[in-house]
Amino acid sequence: DEGHDPVVARSKLDWWRGEGAAMFHGTPQHPVSRALAPVVADFALPESRFGEIIDGMQMDLLQTRYLDWKALHLYCYRVASVVGLLSAEIFGYTNRQTLKYAHDLGLAFQLTNIIRDVGEDARRGRIYLPIDELQRFNVPARQILDGQYSEDFRKLMSFQAERARQLYDQ
């Protein structure tokens, strides 16, 4: 995520995807996966969740913009909600609502990070705010990339903050 060669980063993620599969099939090589394997087995953590996290990381390599909330939601789910869902399994949740809460809290955390990091992400050529919402609030992408924040931008950010608040409250 921090300015690495995308080809190298993608290769590393592919390697970790394979290593994750190896962990679930009893043949991990890396010390981290060897240490994690018994935890995964003890808590019956689903293999698919680990793949979803890597899918989210790959989205960071392949995408710099998201068309709408649905697309951004998927990214937030993969990089944050899935971590909460895995944590709920480890903590031994007993109420099914815990999974919905973990899902929504992950979305809220990631959206909060996106709001916090708008300037930093823009300096790296990324805008995580949905394109359709930029258009709805009349905020050109160039304005964000140039670090120029208008009243329309403030309204857009208020909208995002309210969305995050609602996710925290669910």
Functional labels for PLM-detected ranges:
Residues D1-D169:
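Acidic catalytic motifs of isoprenoid enzymes
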